[in-house]
Amino acid sequence: MQPAKLLMPESFGLSQIGPNIYLESGADETTRTTLREAMVKAESSIRAAYGSVVSRPIVHACISKECYESFGGRGAERAKIFGDRILLSPRGLNWHYLAHEWSHDEIRTRLNFSAWRHMPQWFDEGVAVAISEAPENSETHWQFLIDTNVPRPSRDELLAFRSMKQWLEAVHRYGETQNLERKAKGEPEVRPVYTAAGHELRPWLATLGSAGFLRFIERLNSGEDFDTVYRNGNTATEKYITQSMLAIPAHSSP
């Protein structure tokens, strides 16, 4: 019942501040401006990745924990999506988390039901991480995980997180659900699963570009096997990286 309240946001403490944007009543003008600007930036990031924007999610933003939880959110989360309804927590009021959830809606809108149903969860999340550019899931964070020996999924393990259930179990197993406790202790937060997915998808998306990504989606919609189509794109990525490295002049250390 809680997510259903998003269908009537103005009846449950939210006010419309722009097209498809609702914000918890009582928010100051700075927060309103920040959210409107985040909407523009998030849309721009979706367009850059997909070449255009076909989805139009409705954004619901909370400035209090009570508001977020009243719509079905949980304390440790920054954002979540219910169909085409994005819910932002007080910790997720920026373009990064808005773009992340928007990417889920965009790819769901572009895929037919069969293709969407067969798309692995790691891929959906990895695309969203790469597009949203959140510092918490960046290559810098990936290197931090390596340098500090934080447990993280291997590539083979990551590619096995196909269902939402498998994904959420991995997120819990690798400690991403304990970040509030880490923060309270003054310890750095870790996000090995989401960051691993972004690490896998960044070079793949960069090599394909928006046109190649759209061709990939078309092939899935035509009924081609996901793993085969992804592997073809990943082979192109590996060739691109190898060629780029060969093009760099060699330098000797003094």
Question: Positions of the model-derived regions?
Answer:
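Short charge-dense sequence patches
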Residues: 1, 48-56, 75-84, 143-152, ...
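Surface-exposed aromatic
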Residues: 84-88, 125, 198
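N-terminal low-structure segments adjacent to metalloprotease catalytic domains
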Residues: 1-15, 246-254
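Juxtacatalytic substrate-recognition/specificity segment
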Residues: 6-120, 134, 226
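N-terminal functional modules and adjacent low-complexity/disordered segments of proteins
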Residues: 2-3, 108, 163
